[in-house]
Amino acid sequence: MILIICENILATKTVALSLGANTEAANGIYTSDTVTVANIPPRFIRQTPLCELAEGEYPFMPDKFRMSVTMKELERQLKPLFRAAGEVVFASDGGADAQARFFNICRHFRVGCPRSRMWLTRLSYGAIRGAFHFRESGRHLHRLAQTGLVSKGMDMLFAYNIDQTFLHIGLPEYDLTRQEAIALDYVGDLTGRFDNYNGIPDGHSIRVNVNGGEGFESEAVWEAEEDALAVADEIPVGETVSATLTVDETDRLNIRFHTLLTLQMDAFNNLGFMPVQTLRLAQSLYDKGLISSPLTRCSHLPEKLRGHIQTVFPETPGYRWGENDATIDHHAIITLRAIDRELPEKEKQLYWLIFNRMKAVVEQQPSRKYATVEFKIGEAVFYRQWELTGEAYEVTETGSFQTGVTIADAAVYPCDAPVAESNAFTDVMCAVTSKAEYVDEMMHTNVPYTLETGDYGSALDSLVRKGLVTLDGDDVYLSPEGQYVYDEFAGREFAEMLLTWQFEANDLYEGDQTGRSVIEGFSSSLLCMVETIDPEAGE
């Protein structure tokens, strides 16, 4: 008998129906002659909080963590199922955090039979049967679980010790998570740069008008106005100079399908939904089989889904199918079927937001064309760039061409004051996520999207709810309480330390080190962090 474990009741029912397990043996357990599908909620096994183990000790860096079962009746129902199983399959759309929960379940029930994984990216009958047929097994799943276990251990170590540190130095407990600390540090740095920004231009550029009014900007910037004026005096006003016209074509700036991050950003900007609300609504739509899994950072679709997309949009000129980082198990968020029943209004709004993004992607121009005219006078280079649209897009070929421009006039201007970084909520959400993911992307750790360590939108949302960050319209700032916390972090590179150790945990997936070495290294770094904030720690 094959035992399949799911983590929510709607997914359990859908998987059971898809695989013919039509007999309900107990609440949340469905069987057939060959397959049993059981719902085991994430809260089934509880990690014992360190505050219950520390007995007041601070700092507290235990070698081992404890866990306990919270649902005894379900445990009694599951024991005979695990004993009878010839294979245990985990069916989920989650990443390392979900795989770690499955690992703990198997350890609790002392599973000795083979284990495998179904990736439930889409809760449709065909997709579920395909995932079951092509279920994965192998050492990489154990390594994925180790990444999740180590990440959870670091969460617990950080949460307990940073709370105790704050209490020891006279601040309240904020139940700060690692992700919230990283986000708070980013907002604090950003707020500091805004406070120090004086808007004074720090150089001069030359602007040239040619051929009836088009403006060209010098590529170089001169610190002294006299130097810029000397260059401007050499510009032959009224004469024609040779120039190069370059037309480039790129799809780099095209609209992409939604990821969880862009969906949270889009929903905030267009619907006013906070990130946690967007995630909850998207999870509900996924559970109902209306959209694919929202737990993704991939903005592309695999070739295998071309047929599905073309049942909705027969022509897809705006999307270039082909090689990308999407697979049938990990891809962008898309709608799977039409709404066939009454939905809560906010779920309906989010569904149509996803659908309209899909429509925009497939109906856009397949690429964008940009024209750049560049000419040189002495050592000074002047350029102008614009996007080609409409008929110009259709008739203009790519390449480089020689042309000429007649200079009408030239003048020296103070440089525009440098544009400060944006503190718009969605821009901050995007920036802190990009910062957190940068090393993993560069080093290709390839860890599937993991909600507990990757959702910085929800971390910022939590900071707002805790009163550490203020949301003023669409902009975010540190609150006075947040400033007190940030003052303990400022200039000490704590966020970089936390991100470094998360990368080390993610690197476990590649099998390059052990979980114990990562936890020990993180504990040492965390102890240094605690002692930096509170020199009296441990006394």
Task: For each feature predicted by the language model, list its residue ranges.
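Long, highly charged, low-complexity internal segments
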Residues: 17, 34-39, 43-70, 76, ...
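Extended, well-folded interaction surfaces typified by the phenylalanyl-tRNA synthetase beta subunit core
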Residues: 262, 284, 288-290, 314-322
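Short glycine-centered, acidic/aromatic-flanked micro-motifs in structured strand/loop junctions
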Residues: 92-93, 265-267, 295
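Intrinsically disordered, low-complexity regulatory segments
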Residues: 1-162, 185-188, 402, 410-421
